């Protein structure tokens, strides 16, 4: 289904054109951790390559920069954790071909855990062996994205786990969060810029989201949880939301342009407390906008759509899109999207056309999960089934949909649209003109809607190219 003009113009107004990079740079795809990509994903379930020669026990998230994908294939997971060599190699693959470019065996010290690829940006890949809840602390190794060479090792250890992820500052500094702390590390040297304490409900699921100077995390509160804002510049705590009732929670917040902050607070305690929360950060506090009943989903990662929607599951397991500001239901899948066995942990990637790629796996290495592709109105377009599909999918800068399972890795990709065909409908017409005019002016980042010649500004030069391709 082709995307409407309304969706694409709204994308520009909501800041899709201002994303700093088109790469899937961390667990949630971007600093806001909202799983929205600035590229169009594949139109069909046709794999351009598959790797079946890298089996593992646990398949971790694919992280991308340019034409490179970074991921860990964990082959050892027994306690006590005394792994053999190469138990959790970092693999760098060429996204276009699937060929391995380099591997890295992160040094192991007693009490360390499996290697994690935390994120990648500006030619640097951040990996380490912290985590295991928050039981393991380890130094961060910064690698060259091109060669895998070690650029530096951090001064301090972090306890950030694979399910938490990091958030990048605009200057590239990574921000790590774990059960009891937040830490900003200098991207050039590995030195700690600042360190703050926090509290979190369950270790291993305490990730940060960043929007401008604001870092959003979840914290424990009397008889529940709350969202707290910290300064990304100083690390100082600024203010917190009201308490969201409930016992434990195993999800992290994510955010959207305009001050929206979302939190899936569900712990299988019933309809009065298993709720999806939408807040607005007013600059001095949090305003509760709405709540919606939802399903118990530990370790889930939902996302936003380019036209101002946000995804979640209904109590019966239907995928929904609700309005970010009002909570009004916009779309719902015709059927539930639940895992066949055990609990469901939704993992989504949303492309620039508003299409939602939904993984219903619960991360178990021996469980087959379904990855469904939905239109912006949540009509199912296609699906695939993959064993042990933990933490994927991811959308790379060229529109590749990357899927990591315990037995295979897949790349799904469709050829991009013509340069001036901004809505990918096969014609250059008034709809494309509307998109270009809606994005008129300087781009805050790249890619930028309407910037056809990629010079950083949507202007008369782009208009000339569009008019020259009319038809």
Name each model-derived stretch:
Residues 42, 94-95, 120, 144-145, ...:
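Short, acidic, Ser/Thr-enriched surface-loop or helix-capping motifs
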Residues 87, 101, 122, 137, ...:
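Surface-exposed or flexible loop/turn and strand-edge residues in extracellular/cell-surface modules
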């Amino acid at each position: 289904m082709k995307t409407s003009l309304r969706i694409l113009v709204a994308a520009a107004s909501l800041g899709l054109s201002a994303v700093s990079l088109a790469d899937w740079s961390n667990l949630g795809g971007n600093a806001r951790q909202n799983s929205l990509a600035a590229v169009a994903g594949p139109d069909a379930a046709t794999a351009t390559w598959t790797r079946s020669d890298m089996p593992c026990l646990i398949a971790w998230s694919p992280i991308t920069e340019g034409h490179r994908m970074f991921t860990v294939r964990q082959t050892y997971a027994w306690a006590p954790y005394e792994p053999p060599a190469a138990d959790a190699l970092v693999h760098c693959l060429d996204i276009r071909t699937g060929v391995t470019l380099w591997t890295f065996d992160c040094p192991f010290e007693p009490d360390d855990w499996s290697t994690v690829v935390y994120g990648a940006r500006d030619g640097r890949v951040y990996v380490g062996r912290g985590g295991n809840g928050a039981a393991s602390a380890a130094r961060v190794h910064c690698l060259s994205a091109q060669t895998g060479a070690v650029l530096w090792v951090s001064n301090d250890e972090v306890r950030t786990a694979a399910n938490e992820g990091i958030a990048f500052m605009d200057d590239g500094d990574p921000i790590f969060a774990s059960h009891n702390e937040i830490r900003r590390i200098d991207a050039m040297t590995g030195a700690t810029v600042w360190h703050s304490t926090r509290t979190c409900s369950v270790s291993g699921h305490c990730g940060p989201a960043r929007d401008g100077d604001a870092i959003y995390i979840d914290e424990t509160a009397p008889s529940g949880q709350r969202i707290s804002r910290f300064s990304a510049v100083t690390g100082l705590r600024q203010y917190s939301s009201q308490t969201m009732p409930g016992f434990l929670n195993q999800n992290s917040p994510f955010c959207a342009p305009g001050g929206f902050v979302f939190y899936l607070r569900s712990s299988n305690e019933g309809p009065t407390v298993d709720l999806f929360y939408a807040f607005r950060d007013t600059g001095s506090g949090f305003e509760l906008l709405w709540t919606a009943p939802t399903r118990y989903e530990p370790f889930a990662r939902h996302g936003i759509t380019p036209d101002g929607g946000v995804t979640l599951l209904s109590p019966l397991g239907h995928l929904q899109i609700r309005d970010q500001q009002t909570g009004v239901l916009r779309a719902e899948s015709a059927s539930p999207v639940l895992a066949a066995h055990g609990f469901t942990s939704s993992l989504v990637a949303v492309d620039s056309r508003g299409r939602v790629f939904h993984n219903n796996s619960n991360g178990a290495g021996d469980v087959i999960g379904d990855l469904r592709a939905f239109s912006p109105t949540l009509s199912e377009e296609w699906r695939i089934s993959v064993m042990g599909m933990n933490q994927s999918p991811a959308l790379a800068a060229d529109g590749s949909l990357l899927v990591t399972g315990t037995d295979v890795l897949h790349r799904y990709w469709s050829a991009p649209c013509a340069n001036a065909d901004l809505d990918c409908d096969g014609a250059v017409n008034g709809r494309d003109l509307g998109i270009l005019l809606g994005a008129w002016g300087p781009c805050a980042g790249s890619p930028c809607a309407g910037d056809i010649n990629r010079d950083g500004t949507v202007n008369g030069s782009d208009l000339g190219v569009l008019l020259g391709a009319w038809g």
